[in-house]
Amino acid sequence: MQALATRPSAIRPTKAARRSSVVVRADGFIGSSTNLIMVASTTATLAAARFGLAPTVKKNTTAGLKLVDSKNSAGVISNDPAGFTIVDVLAMGAAGHGLGVGIVLGLKGIGAL
């Protein structure tokens, strides 16, 4: 029984690994073709909605896909003369990002990017 008591334990605490600092840089992204595509697609969808070329909270579509003015069903108040709200900004920003991702992945798929 004495041998069991003096045997070193099988579980030894391990030292924590040293952490090294990691530097993340965006040098290759700012101004790259991917960045320009994302900026252009988001800007295009926001501009289309702001200037009445796409549906917004204030401009809904009919069954024939015509834009018609309607009352603000979202209940969001806007000081913008065209009635552009934060709901429109978020929706069109998401649509622009989706469009941009599709363009980038399509161009990468055919090897053009």
From Swiss-Prot:
Gene Ontology terms describing biological process: photosynthesis
**Where can this protein be found?**
Plastid, Chloroplast thylakoid membrane
Membrane topology listed for this record:
Multi-pass membrane protein
Please name the InterPro entries in this protein's record.
PSI_PsaG/PsaK, PSI_PsaG/PsaK_dom, PSI_PsaG/PsaK_pln, PSI_PsaK_pln
Keywords assigned: Chloroplast, Membrane, Photosynthesis, Photosystem I, Plastid, Thylakoid, Transit peptide, Transmembrane, Transmembrane helix
* Keyword Transmembrane helix found: yes
GO CC terms, sorted: chloroplast thylakoid membrane; photosystem I
Top-level taxon of origin:
Eukaryota
Protein name per Swiss-Prot or TrEMBL: Photosystem I reaction center subunit psaK, chloroplastic
Q: State the organism of origin.
A: Chlamydomonas reinhardtii (Chlamydomonas smithii)
Q: Which gene encodes it?
A: PSAK
